[in-house]
Amino acid sequence: IDELDIPTLGTIVHEYIHFLQNVSTPWGLYDSMVRYNIMAETYAFVENATSTITLPLDIDYSPELANKIAIVKCGMGYCPLADTRRNDFRIDVNERICIHRKYKQLNNRTLPVITLDICFTDGSKQAITLGANIIKESMAALYQMLIDETATHERYDLPYNLVKIIAEQHFSAIASDNIKLITICYISLFSLSPAEVLINEL
């Protein structure tokens, strides 16, 4: 590690934070268990098939697993890194991000949904659902920038700089305290509703 340059060390720390998010938080463990159950039921579907299997698979997961998948999907929120519709996620920080809180009924649970109205520097606007995807990336990027100040992820404010930008616009008292922002991101992953906890704690 002593021989690594600062950018490489920062990248390694960023990815190691993702490892910790996945193995040391209730959200990470719940998500992993749901994915494992998906693999188990998929394997059982293939193993028990009595006719030719066609792709893509169309599996009716058990009601219990389907419910857990819906909880994870709701908590994960939007994933900009999987969005192929745009390749520049620079946020216009002069336009205030609007935060909306709604609720979604899922069987016998009421799940909070936090949506954000975001303006980009190219003039386009987008409403996104805040969730663990963005929170995890923002947290890892904040850690990375503690080591490598040049890792600003300029073209990718969403997801890497979003928590910082929200803090600067709405919670200025803590916006300059990156350690506190990292801590709040981490705390939010101790819930099945990470976005709500993040906004509440900010």
Identify the role of each PLM range.
Residues I1-V13, A127, G131:
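Short pre-active-site segment immediately N-terminal to the catalytic Zn-binding motif
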Residues I6, N22-E64, D117-D122:
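Post-HEXXH active-site segment of zinc metalloproteases
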Residues D60-L202:
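Long, well-structured alpha-helical subdomains associated
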